Amino acid sequence: MKRILISRTDSIGDVALTLPMCQALRSKYPEAEIIFIGKNYTRPLVKCFKAIDDFWDIDELFNQPITSQLEQLKADCIIHVFPNKKLAFLAKKAKIPVRIGTSHRVFHLFTCNMRPNFTRKNSNLHESQLNFHLLAPLGVTEIPSFQQIQELVQFQVAPTELPSWIPTSNDSRIILHPKSKGSALEWPLEKYMELALQLAESGKTVCFTGTEQEGTQFRHLLPVHDRIIDTTGKLSLDQLICFISQSNALVACSTGPYHIAGLSGIHAIGLFSMRRPIDPGRWRAIGPKAEYLVFDQTCQSCKKGTHCTCIENIEVSTVLELIG
């Protein structure tokens, strides 16, 4: 294998949990060129993956003339981690010899010649482990344990200049990231505000992060305190990654910044429901200091798979205790 393409064109958290399989490929094929195809906004995250040689923006690829697309897609193998119908047909047209995709997509029957049969929805495996099923056709047949997954991570944050108004001391800086763009069940905003105030009054610097749109949903609720800072809408992803890596801890639900914090090696605290398939068994962050909280490990509503708001019952005091 001289050139391997890995396609994961969804969100930051999903891309973050693709890192271990990239590292496994690097170990299996140390001389291969490994290229990641994704949404352009995830580029800064992928740049931190030491196993990846290059990043291609899928929209930029599709905007090229078809002849240029086919020329660019010259490779020995493509792995469709997140199925994309247009890319799957394009990869076949480009005559990539090994085209790997799950058997659970009808269009893969016509576009992929290697179709591992596995299901994500009802699996007990972590998302990062599930991705390894796609490596079986390449000779990586063992699914690593979650502990082994932790050891596979090689994440290197590039130094990035941060705005001058960002506090420089990081030993007492806690990041709170309340929103998730609707991708996860969220802890109540009022509890984030209570947590922020208690942390600030104990001498911590509290920074709220999120997009500008997310900031408009809670900015007016922020307690007035010298140690509580609103950064929403003010940081690029490059800056956010660097900012997180230089902080002491981060609290969020199951969303991208939680996974960035875990990979960065800081104390990452994720707030979860136990309902599958959005439970921490599937989506907890990878990292030496990554942890998670649920209200009730045995929640019956979650076990039944019904809509449950038990995450809202996680106490502020419990989160404070875990922050330490």
What are these regions (language model features)?
Residues M1-G324:
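Catalytic machinery of carbohydrate-active enzymes
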